[in-house]
Amino acid sequence: MFAKLESLERKYEDLERQLSAPDVVSDQERFRKLSKTHSDLSDVVAAFREYKKIAQDLEDNQEMAQDPDPEIRELAQAETKALKEAQVELEARLKVLLLPKDPMDEKNILLEIRAGTGGDEAALFAGDLFRMYTRYAETKRWKVEIMSQSETGSGGFKEVIASISGDKVYSRLKYESGAHRVQRVPATESQGRIHTSAVTVAIMPEAEEVDVAIDPNELRIDVYRSSGPGGQSVNTTDSAVRVTHIPSGLVVICQDEKSQHKNKAKALKVLRSRLLQVEQDKQRAEQEAARRSQVGTGDRSERIRTYNFPQGRVTDHRINLTLYRLDAVLEGDLDELCGALIGHYQAEALKAQADAA
């Protein structure tokens, strides 16, 4: 591990020299790429330099520990204990920083929320989840843009698709995909019985044209008049667009914009991300099948999280984490949940790395 860290530090220092060279500064594209690599290495290099400083301080403390003055020896022992604890924490952090990076982590995302079982109550909860993610995005200064929505008369969503753009959006939200279950008493329930409903969430890295090439000959594009809740027409022109990707059968409908051109652009953006997700899911399924053949399966991904309103709790079933602050979570306070999930999957990756060694 330390040989790799030394190599990364040398690379970091070389990048610093290159970034100050006039020929690099004058080449914007090259400067941008080198700056990105330099930025990517900054955390691990800073942690490694701190680790080396602690190692040097420990070495210096050995001399103090031999001092004839008992007070100085006692002080050295206390400092050594604190330094060793910091060294252990830093070593663990360095192992995480050296894990292979998910190439999608830097990407923006498409968020898809669909009401599942539970009728109107599921649609209302789909709206609650969309507001939750929107508020979380606001705290991170991310930009949210609705791509497509299908509202219900009760104020919920049958489906809503939005793009979220900003700093490392996918890395924070990628573990939100799955079935979210809600348990609460509907406003229309006269007996006070708790109903259980489900909503599915999909987090897809936003694909760019370089990620997924779409052959125009493989698309069928239909245009028609937009319609709102209940089927009423909201537009007198054929501005709604339905794009069908013939080889995969994927269909995307966009009708939120008054312009047919804008709806088509949004639909293609969603389609591109869905095709990228299909390819990623295929690769993950192949990897998971290989893993299951060796270690068996314990799949609990169907229901990833439960939101229980009577108890005011949120439980993430993948990591057995329960928080008794449902209101704060639904207001967009997701950092503890997201952080715990990221930590869990980093630990899983470290274990897999150790098992393979």
Swiss-Prot record:
InterPro entries: PCRF, Pep_chain_release_fac_I, Pep_chain_release_fac_I_sf, Prokaryotic/Mito_RF, RF-1. One of its GO terms (cellular component) is cytoplasm. Gene3D superfamilies: 3.30.160.20, 3.30.70.1660, 6.10.140.1950. The keyword Magnesium does not apply. The modification N5-methylglutamine is found at residue 232. Keywords: Cytoplasm, Methylation, Protein biosynthesis. It holds the Pfam family RF-1. SUPFAM superfamilies: Release factor. Signal peptide: none annotated. Belongs to the prokaryotic/mitochondrial release factor family. This is Peptide chain release factor 1. It comes from Solidesulfovibrio magneticus (strain ATCC 700980 / DSM 13731 / RS-1). The lineage of its organism: Bacteria, Pseudomonadati, Thermodesulfobacteriota, Desulfovibrionia, Desulfovibrionales. The gene is prfA.
